Amino acid sequence: MSFADTWPYPRWIAHRGAGKLAPENTLAAFRLGAQYGFRMFECDVKLSSDGVPFLLHDATLQRTTNARQKIGPGNSAIASDHPWGTLAQLDAGGWHSRSFAGEPLPTLDAVAAYCIANRYLLNIEIKPTPGSERHTGEIVAQHAVRLWQGQPVPPLLTSFQVEALQGAMETQPELPRGLLLDTLWTGWLETALTLGCQAIVCNHALWDRSSVSQAQSAGFRTLSYTVNDEWAAQRLIDLGTDGIITDRVDLFSPAG
């Protein structure tokens, strides 16, 4: 748990780049979040059919790309069914607003280059396609080690999927990991310990004095998603938690 003792990450983390102010999980979103003063970003990473890690939240492409028009209605909408060459041609910005039309899906390599060049930090949520949890964790971890080689602060890998974190741990145990929770299911603390995690990342409503004490007493850092109200953020600060993931890059000052 020594990594948790010397936690290098800031309190404020921009959700999917810049929350809802820009197309999520794009470099345009990262650039906008940075303009608001954020220095750490959260993003979702999955694999193309040919094993390229890229940013996308959903299992399917329709909500945040023009896949219906570009790929056609008769073809699979599942992102992981397509090679990167196909995915790279999609517009991942036009759905949000006309000003972002033409913004592509970024690879993890592109995001790493941007973050490293600007000394920004990254939280990679591993978002595997069902059935490929362990493999996705392995590949994302391998890429992360290669991309951040020689950098002072590696990315924080998180996932709701235990098998994805197992894959990351077994492949690159030196990378910091965090278990994502939407409920405090039976055995959550023991599972995080078994996975060698450094952090617990909860739905913010799950944190209270008891759960914070349990996690911190076991050596974990305590992070929350997705916090968009001032009262909720203040409650978490008062509880002594360590990190807040927010869409509201326009509301919260990361310097505060």
What residue spans do the PLM features occupy?
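Phosphate-group recognition and catalysis centered on beta-loop-alpha active-site segments
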Residues: 1-256
